[in-house]
Amino acid sequence: MQHTKILHLVILATALFSLLLVSATYSGYIYAQNSQTKFRAKLDSNNEVPPVNSTAEGVATFKLKNNTVNTKINITGITDLSGAQILSGKKGENGQPIVDLLKKVQKTKTSGGVAVEGSFTASDFEGAMKGKALSALQSAMGTNETYVNIKTKDHPDGEIRGQIKPKGSSSPTQ
């Protein structure tokens, strides 16, 4: 009888240890998924919904550091930039604004285009993301659920757009 009790305790201890090990491993996996800090979007008029006729194109990059997102957007073929936002939405879907990328920026005209550099924090969020932590945006950016939309006077709903993905990801950018 004593031998059976000891065997049961050993089995119970082994099961608890296994659960703790799986839990710790899973937590590490979740952290690794959300630890991506660099993101990129390739901007193009064919990605607009519906697509527009424009030769403009660009690249937007985002780097998360110390609860701040630093942004860089380089665009060619546009000189009259009137808006730049991150919005929620998958490829082919229009979504709701998350953050205005022109709120805190330094905008310079380049030969044949525009370069924008700036930053934002979670306090700049609007819409459904308002009041949420930066990690919520980080998670959405890592799963292709956000996009950048660039607006102009000729195309007030958007001239070029691109899905945000982790930098270096091999998944499609559009």
Model region roles, listed by residue range:
Residues Q2, V22-A84, S88-Q174:
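Metal-centered catalytic cores of metalloenzymes
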Residues I11-S23:
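Bacterial N-terminal signal peptides
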